[in-house]
Curated annotation (Swiss-Prot):
Residues 251-264 have a biased composition (Basic and acidic residues). CDD domains: SRPBCC_PITPNA-B_like (cd08888). It is linked to Defects in Pitpna are the cause of the vibrator phenotype which is characterized by early-onset progressive action tremor, degeneration of brain stem and spinal cord neurons, and juvenile death. The mutation is due to the insertion of an intracisternal A particle retrotransposon in intron 4 which results in a 5-fold reduction in protein levels. GO terms for cellular component: cytoplasm; cytosol; membrane; myelin sheath; nucleus. This is Phosphatidylinositol transfer protein alpha isoform. Catalyzes the transfer of phosphatidylinositol (PI) and phosphatidylcholine (PC) between membranes. Shows a preference for PI and PC containing shorter saturated or monosaturated acyl chains at the sn-1 and sn-2 positions. Preference order for PC is C16:1 > C16:0 > C18:1 > C18:0 > C20:4 and for PI is C16:1 > C16:0 > C18:1 > C18:0 > C20:4 > C20:3. It comes from Mus musculus.
Length: 271
């Protein structure tokens, strides 16, 4: 049994802008989660092309997670089992990410399939699932300006879209009705990231607990990440994809150094 949910994240940026903003924010957020032997290690970051014509950027990363999983898993899992591998195929505006664990092999899987569409999250079944499968998928809307969707320990005033105003674009702050107002603002673009998340965790006695925990953490991650992405708008809105590739090279070097020298930091599990 696997647990499927679709998270819909609406943003006041265009689909083209988001391509740069997402990659910039992934690089920055990785630094905030890396230190004390934990965090992100980038193994591969290179273009790919498949036989069917799909092409884009392929990345393979290892996440060293010791303090970022619940205590009940830490107590049961042997040393080294808390590293997960993330392989991503970014054929923007479609992206596919597969997360696995060498210790659990085929008993553990997180798959995130994302379509980026120029709408307000109104499309049903953008991932073209079979009707019977789609019937069982829960659609969850993430509002980046809703303070109640953010854990108090994750909240940062400088990463609050309800307070941020972009100097370069004039966008923000986002009020309680910002999504409805977007429709009438002809000068402000918008888009939705439709994130279909499949979670499989086969471990007798823990399956439901861990699958629900993973979905809770994915929602938390998507919420915090997209709040940051919008509040960092002025840092990335003028960048090109060439700028991003140069930045990713530098970030890889920094992450290797930070993992060895910095203290543990970033998001930890809610036990």
């Amino acid at each position: 049994m696997v647990l499927l949910k679709e998270y819909r994240v609406i943003l006041p940026v265009s689909v083209d802008e988001y391509q740069v903003g997402q990659l910039y924010s992934v690089a920055e957020a990785s630094k905030n989660e890396t230190g004390g032997g934990e965090g992100v290690e980038v193994l591969v970051n290179e273009p790919y092309e498949k036989d069917d014509g799909e092409k884009g950027q392929y990345t393979h990363k290892i996440y060293h997670l010791q303090s970022k999983v619940p205590t009940f898993v830490r107590m049961l899992a042997p040393e080294g089992a808390l590293n997960i591998h993330e392989k991503a195929w970014n054929a923007y505006p479609y992206c596919r990410t597969v997360i696995t664990n060498e210790y659990m092999k085929e008993d553990f899987l997180i798959k995130i399939e994302t379509w980026h569409k120029p709408d307000l999250g109104t499309q049903e079944n953008v991932h073209k699932l079979e009707p019977e499968a789609w019937k069982h998928v829960e659609a969850i809307y993430i509002d980046i300006a809703d303070r109640s969707q953010v854990l108090s320990k994750d909240y940062k005033a400088e990463e609050d879209p309800a307070k941020f105003k972009s100097v370069k674009t004039g966008r923000g702050p986002l009020g309680p009705n910002w999504k409805q107002e977007l429709v009438n603002q002809k000068d402000c673009p918008y888009m939705c990231a439709y994130k279909l998340v499949t979670v499989k965790f086969k471990w007798w006695g823990l399956q439901n607990k861990v699958e629900n925990f993973i979905h809770k953490q994915e929602k938390r991650l998507f919420t915090n990440f997209h709040r940051q992405l919008f509040c960092w708008l002025d840092k990335w809105v003028d960048l090109t994809m060439d700028d991003i590739r140069r930045m990713e090279e530098e970030t890889k070097r920094q992450l290797d150094e930070m993992r060895q020298k910095d203290p543990v930091k970033g998001m930890t599990a809610d036990d």
